[in-house]
Amino acid sequence: MVDNTQITKTISLEDYGIKNATVHYQLSPEELHNKTIKLGQGVESSSGALAVNTGEFTGRSPKDRFIVKDEVTKDKVWWGDINIPFDTKKFDSLYNKVAEYLGDKDVYARDAYACADEKYRLNIRVLNEYPWSNLFAFNMFLRPENQELDNFKEDWLVLNAPGFKANPEVDGTRQENFAILNFSKKIALIGGTGYTGEIKKGIFSALNFVLPVYENTLPMHCSANVGEDGDTAIFFGLSGTGKTTLSADPERKLIGDDEHGWTKENTIFNFEGGCYAKVINLSEENEPDIYKAIKPGAILENVALDANGDVDFEDVTITQNTRVSYPINHINNIQKPSTGENPKNIFFLTADAFGVLPPISKLTPGQAAYHFISGYTAKVAGTEAGVDEPVPSFSACFGAPFMPLHPTEYAEMLSKKMKAADVNVWLVNTGWTGGPYGVGSRMKLKYTREMISSALEGKLENVDYEKHNIFGLEMPKTCEGVPSEVLNPRNTWKDQNAYDLKAKELSNFFRKNFRKFEEYANEEIMNGAPVE
């Protein structure tokens, strides 16, 4: 709960090299909303939420994300296409340019923090060029009580200047936009892009280094909820697999929908204070929690509005990546504070468009590590190109773009924690059944919810299982509320020989993707691989 006492504190930005700026410190959501409209940077939708257009960039730009290579990072970061090194001197020069750019401007400053567990709290100061970016920071990070602001000292600084354009030839960037992490100076420097997700994912990436390296805590790209008995469930999954949908359960309290830590004390905590949900094709019937959260204080990004300010959630004219951010207290059924104990069940969600993987299966520790490192889902190709074949997509740890360390480091931490806590790990296919995309149909959400509920309630502990002939996964033969023929995907295909061929094809994709990890993976992990 944020108190409403008047904030009288003021701050100077001179120490950051930002001279003569007009500083707007810790403005309320209402003030930031009104300033955005007054500046012509957004409009109010019929629900009272602020609607903005983020400009040229409507999503993250992973090829323009850098980490400063220095004494802290050079031997720890897994350098490559995901973690691209940046020169220390170039960083200092670029930082000074951004600071100079923000001089004489209105700058919106916010003190906030990440990590709902006080032991792991990371204080953040966010400096924004635009008021709506600062409202995003209010929504997404945890909000300190006003009395905490008097002695607030940031651990990390986020400097965010969407209007600043880098000169790639001079500044060492790839193009005019950039998001750079400096672990020695503890700065996230973001410029040339108005996409607010860069702010959120900048701090997430920082925590994905800081927590495992210094705190023996596993950072996870997952959602989490907790039952009445205090049992925590964790849902890993890439975009579009159902993380947000499936963790919103009327019988369980939401801890968070995207970023969490699993501590050495075997507790779970949310990194964030808000949610950043996709709203493409959103309906009140399918996603009531998100739909109702779109109210004053929320920010809609890149959506289409009609003359009355009503949102057309099916309109993808600007982007398919339409979003809403809101503080977590816009949702009713939440855990306060956003922490949990004793993880009992972990779900790896995948939308398998090949129609091969079972709707639910139980994993051994080796299989769990293998599938965690693989991070598989499938993308359905765009119809404009006339391509109907699904495309496999692998993202290590279900969040490769945000993981500075080698994926096997996170996988080994997860394995140790799973064994110590005796956790059940389930692979859940929210994708296709009865054939691949174009032939089969999407798994019914009703069935997926039934299977997850059965797993959470322990109803799958005493049923018979059968082993998948290629992936070696243990598939329950029965599950309450789900037709038994659905549980073995091979039985849902008219042509079972075609199924076997498709399963081998998918198995080959898995094995090919995993080659780059083989030299780092132990025997137990390699035993979790599908057969050739």
UniProtKB/Swiss-Prot annotation:
Family as reported in the entry's similarity comment: Belongs to the phosphoenolpyruvate carboxykinase (ATP) family.
SUPFAM superfamilies: PEP carboxykinase N-terminal domain (SSF68923), PEP carboxykinase-like (SSF53795)
Encoding gene, per UniProt annotation: pckA
Keywords tagged on the record: ATP-binding, Cytoplasm, Decarboxylase, Gluconeogenesis, Lyase, Manganese, Metal-binding, Nucleotide-binding
Any single Gene Ontology cellular-component annotation: cytosol
Molecular function per GO: ATP binding; metal ion binding; phosphoenolpyruvate carboxykinase (ATP) activity
Top-rank taxon: Bacteria
Enzyme Commission number(s) from the entry: 4.1.1.49
UniProt cross-references to PANTHER family, sorted A to Z: PHOSPHOENOLPYRUVATE CARBOXYKINASE (ATP), PHOSPHOENOLPYRUVATE CARBOXYKINASE ATP
Organism phylogeny: Bacteria, Pseudomonadati, Bacteroidota, Flavobacteriia, Flavobacteriales
Protein name: Phosphoenolpyruvate carboxykinase (ATP)
Localization in the cell: Cytoplasm
Gene Ontology BP term (one): gluconeogenesis
Recorded metabolic or biological pathway in which this protein acts: Carbohydrate biosynthesis; gluconeogenesis
Protein function: Involved in the gluconeogenesis. Catalyzes the conversion of oxaloacetate (OAA) to phosphoenolpyruvate (PEP) through direct phosphoryl transfer between the nucleoside triphosphate and OAA.
Residues annotated for ATP binding in this entry: 201, 221, 237-245, 287, 323, 448
Cofactor(s) this protein cannot do without: Mn(2+)
